[in-house]
């Protein structure tokens, strides 16, 4: 079995597969992905593979510079997005936006 390159919480799987979630915001430990990378995607909870994505763009962002567009690309409100990011990465402020499409 091939290892997954990136994982997402299971609660995001349906939005990714439906094309409603088209970015992910990560910390420095996952800042190495580049435009054009093709990644196997698994669920964080059980590492089960569920799709393959292609990275279409990357950029940096801070918690304070997150926008409504980021929230729309994450399929949530800006308030929800800031809370999710703060819950996943407490105390951090610098993040990496990975834009992607399902293949």
Swiss-Prot record:
GO terms for molecular function: hydrolase activity, acting on carbon-nitrogen (but not peptide) bonds, in linear amidines; N4-acetylcytidine amidohydrolase activity. It catalyses: N(4)-acetylcytidine + H2O = cytidine + acetate + H(+); N(4)-acetyl-2'-deoxycytidine + H2O = 2'-deoxycytidine + acetate + H(+); N(4)-acetylcytosine + H2O = cytosine + acetate + H(+). One of its GO terms (biological process) is pyrimidine nucleoside catabolic process. Residues 6-101 form the ASCH domain. Its EC number is 3.5.1.135. Changing residue 27 to A: 2-fold decrease in catalytic efficiency toward N(4)-acetylcytidine and 3-fold decrease in catalytic efficiency toward N(4)-acetylcytosine. Optimum temperature is below 20 degrees Celsius. Signal peptide: none annotated. Coiled coil: none annotated. It comes from the Bacteria. Pfam families: ASCH (PF04266). The active site is at 21 (proton acceptor), 24 (nucleophile), 74 (proton donor). The keyword Hydrolase applies. Optimum pH is 8.0. Unaffected by known inhibitors of amidohydrolases: PMSF, p-hydroxymercuribenzoate, p-chloromercuribenzoate and EDTA. Keywords: Hydrolase. Changing residue 24 to A: Loss of activity. The keyword Magnesium does not apply. Catalyzes the hydrolysis of N(4)-acetylcytidine (ac4C). Can also hydrolyze N(4)-acetyl-2'-deoxycytidine and N(4)-acetylcytosine with lower efficiency. Has weaker activity towards a wide range of structurally different N(4)-acylated cytosines and cytidines. Belongs to the N(4)-acetylcytidine amidohydrolase family. Monomer. This is N(4)-acetylcytidine amidohydrolase. The gene is yqfB.
């Amino acid at each position: 079995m091939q290892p997954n390159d990136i994982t997402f919480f299971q609660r995001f799987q349906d939005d990714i597969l439906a094309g409603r979630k088209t970015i992910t915001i990560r910390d420095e430990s996952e800042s190495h992905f580049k435009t054009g990378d093709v990644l196997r995607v698994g669920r964080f909870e059980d590492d089960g593979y569920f799709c393959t994505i292609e990275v279409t763009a990357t950029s940096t962002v801070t918690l304070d510079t997150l926008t409504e567009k980021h929230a729309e690309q994450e399929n949530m409100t800006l308030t929800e997005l800031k809370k999710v990011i703060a819950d996943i990465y407490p105390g951090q402020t610098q993040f990496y936006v990975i834009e992607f499409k399902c293949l």
